[in-house]
């Protein structure tokens, strides 16, 4: 078809490098949705700098596991409501889901050179 553009795939390491080279901080979002803890750990070993450990769809065990991985790999801990503006889609509204200050403050630290 004339308008077809073939898809291409980047490896995780390439994406991580692109983010870092653009001045960003690569964070693994929604690790539970990967459904493969070995793959999550592999991604964490390849330059990811943070993990979304705090997420409304995580149970207590999930949150504990991802906080432990963050500590093991010296990662930033992030979290979010995953609210996309559709009322009623999620159990909470924007601003109702928060991340403890002890994790948020790490996001404001100057990077070590």
Enumerate the predicted regions with their spans.
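Charged catalytic cores and adjacent phosphate/nucleic-acid-binding surfaces used
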Residues: 14-17, 21-22, 28, 32-113
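Active-site-proximal loop/helix segment associated with metal-binding centers of metalloenzymes
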Residues: 1-8
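Ligand-binding pocket segment of bilobal, Venus flytrap-like solute-binding proteins
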Residues: 11
């Amino acid at each position: 078809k004339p308008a077809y553009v073939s898809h291409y795939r980047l490896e995780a390491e390439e994406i991580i490098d692109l983010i870092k080279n653009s001045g960003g901080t690569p964070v693994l979002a929604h690790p539970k949705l990967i459904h493969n803890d070995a793959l999550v750990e592999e991604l964490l070993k390849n330059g990811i700098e943070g993990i979304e450990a705090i997420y409304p769809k995580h149970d207590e065990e999930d949150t504990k596991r991802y906080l432990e991985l963050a500590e093991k790999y010296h990662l930033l801990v992030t979290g979010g409501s995953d609210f996309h503006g559709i009322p009623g889609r999620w159990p909470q509204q924007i601003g109702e889901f928060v991340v403890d200050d002890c994790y948020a403050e790490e996001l404001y630290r100057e990077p070590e050179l």
